[in-house]
Amino acid sequence: MKKFLYTLLALLLIGLLTTYFILFTEWGNKIIASYIEKKINPNERYLSVKTFKLRFNSLDFKAQANDDSTLILKGDFSLLKQSVDLNYHIDIKNLRSFKDLIPYPLRGAIVTSGNIKGHRKALVIQGVSNVAQSHTAYNALLDDFKLSHLSLNAQDANLEDLLYLINRPAYANARVSLQADFNSLKPLEGHLILTANNALINNALINQIFHLNLKDTLVFNLSHSSDFKGNKAISDTTLTSPLVNFTALKSEYLFSILKLNAPYTLEIPHLAKLQNMINHPLKGSLTLKGDIEQSPKLLKVSGHSNLLDGALDFTLLNKDLKGRFSNISTLKALDLFHYPKFFQSIADVNLDYDLISKQGVLKANLKNAKFLKNSFSDFLYSISKFDITKEIYNDVNLVSQINQQRLLSNLSLKSPKTQLKIHNGLLDLNTKQMDMLMDAEILKFVFKMKLQGNMHQPKFSLILNEKAIQQNLQQGLKEILKNDSIKKGLDHLLKDDKLKEKLEKGLKGLF
């Protein structure tokens, strides 16, 4: 019996000594350090333990990654009580290296330091950081080494750095404040609030992404909140500025496929302020409602607006814009674009446009169309004594080929008494110059008409070729012969063979 007890005590002593040598001696600490490295680096060597000193009541630990990221832990450590009071310093050179630990693709550098205190069931972490050049404080509570709560408060963070950190383009620059509370990091669960005042738009990037032409300095205020749950974020975003107001409520971002779906409302109170962006003056206001869908290879924006007494519906798919105007007033459209009010109608318009090449096709069908009194109607009256403003056109078709700022158009209008056609008429919106040839027929009077010069004050000229003159003379004679008195007189003259011969020769000379 004594032999058994001695053996048991010896084994226990050997076990204690072995545990002591492994845990609390330099030789044993090297074994533990090697084990930690193998556990962290199962396939390739990424992190190496530079210092590992574990004693009865203290710990001194330093690990370094291949990119020179470092982790330092130093302070009180009790293995028996399973309690710690450690100070830490973490310097991460690139968050992208931790993609296996964090479900969101973060990037950039971060430095943080603080204190870890407590025991296995209640471990409290308090720290500070300069993430995105901010003044950030955070608190975390771990239960059995699993995150049960994380709160974060960041002030004066640089928005460009923050957007870079979360792998988003630098749409703007500002100083922002951020408050966040999370109950889990994997999966991400919690709530976040972000605000920014007097933020400055990155014109170059916005122009590149949305194919715009921003020139002026644009300042805005931003309010954003997100709820994270089930590998997605549900967000509310409000942006206000002197130029535009934007709201996206209940937008959804799926982390697994990096996809955004956002219903939005866009308000532009004064379209005149867009002149420097689109190089053209506008009037009035605009409200758009629609949806935004964005993923790494897709940008889809759809929208609807009630305007010009009708409706606009459009879809932007990457660089391709398709728009439809339904039952709009052309008179209000001309007023919107500061064009001369020479024509009124109800129009349906379809637009296919490439935002990169700035080329496309515009097709329009007009009904209840009518010319208004202007220099064009005055010119037609001067040559035909016909008031075209009294005509109603229900068969009007327009097709325009768009190339940059130049429109090459085919236009046809038809009424019971008139017919007007333009083939390959040129309108340059940049120079405001036009060059068009119109084929016209008014009360059987056939002629060509040249429209040239400034679109706001064009010049008109009449062109009569030999065929047109013949047609008009023939029609004139037909109208003359409808007069009974003249017809009887001609019948009497034609009884004289000599006069008849002379008249025939004269008519042949005309035709």
Regions found by a protein language model. Give the residues of each.
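Terminal hydrophobic membrane-targeting helix
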Residues: 16-89, 93, 97, 118
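A glycine-rich beta-turn/hairpin centered on an aromatic-Pro dipeptide
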Residues: 362-391, 397-399
